[in-house]
Design a protein with these regions (language model features):
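N-terminal alpha-helical scaffold/docking segments in eukaryotic complex subunits
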Residues: 1-66
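Short coil/turn segments at helix-helix junctions and helix-capping linkers
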Residues: 115-120
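Amphipathic alpha-helical scaffolding segments comprising HEAT/armadillo-like alpha-solenoid repeats
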Residues: 31-37, 64-77, 99-114, 133-144, ...
Length: 166
């Protein structure tokens, strides 16, 4: 009987290991595709980028893998001088629903609000505005910005979410 139990456990361990390897390969594939697309794309306000279309399609196949890939890219490029890739990650997060990017998306948005680049800080606040979720109100209310323009913008987003948020 013990041999049967050991055999079942070994088979189970092999299946888990195989699943983890498959998931890691899928996440890595998502990361490579997204990173290459972000690097080659232009993100213009009001226009749908090629990468936005790609991320939405990928999201249908594996939300967790896409979020993991975006977090990897975010962490890898957070401290880079050239903010193009970081800006791309933020743009992609902005087109995905608040609930679907939880909690990684919100964590990334909070992180960029302490970035040294002013444009990136604004994009972090803007993410909460674009997500249009009342759940974001309590998070934004806890923030304090040194620069008055960001504090005012955050307060405007809070007012907007209180009035029109879902």
């Amino acid at each position: 009987m013990q041999d049967d139990d050991d055999s079942i456990l070994q088979d189970s361990d092999l299946q888990v290991s195989y699943f983890q390897e498959e998931r890691e390969a899928f996440v890595n594939n998502c990361k490579v595709q997204l990173l290459n697309s972000i690097i080659g794309d232009e993100f213009i306000d009001g226009e749908i980028s090629r990468t936005e279309i790609i991320v939405k399609e990928m999201f249908k196949r594996g939300r967790e893998a896409v979020m993991s890939a975006l977090m990897d890219i975010y962490l890898e490029y957070f401290s880079e001088q050239d903010i193009h890739v970081l800006k791309g990650v933020l743009e992609l997060l902005s087109v995905l629903p608040y609930e679907d990017v939880r909690p990684s998306g919100q964590i990334m948005a909070l992180g960029v609000m302490r970035h040294k680049n002013k444009y990136v800080i604004k994009k972090g606040i803007q993410l909460y505005e674009r997500w249009n979720s009342k759940e974001g109100i309590k998070i934004i209310k806890t923030l304090h910005f040194e620069e008055m323009r960001f504090q005012k913008y955050a307060e405007q987003v809070i007012e907007y979410l209180e009035r029109d948020g879902v």
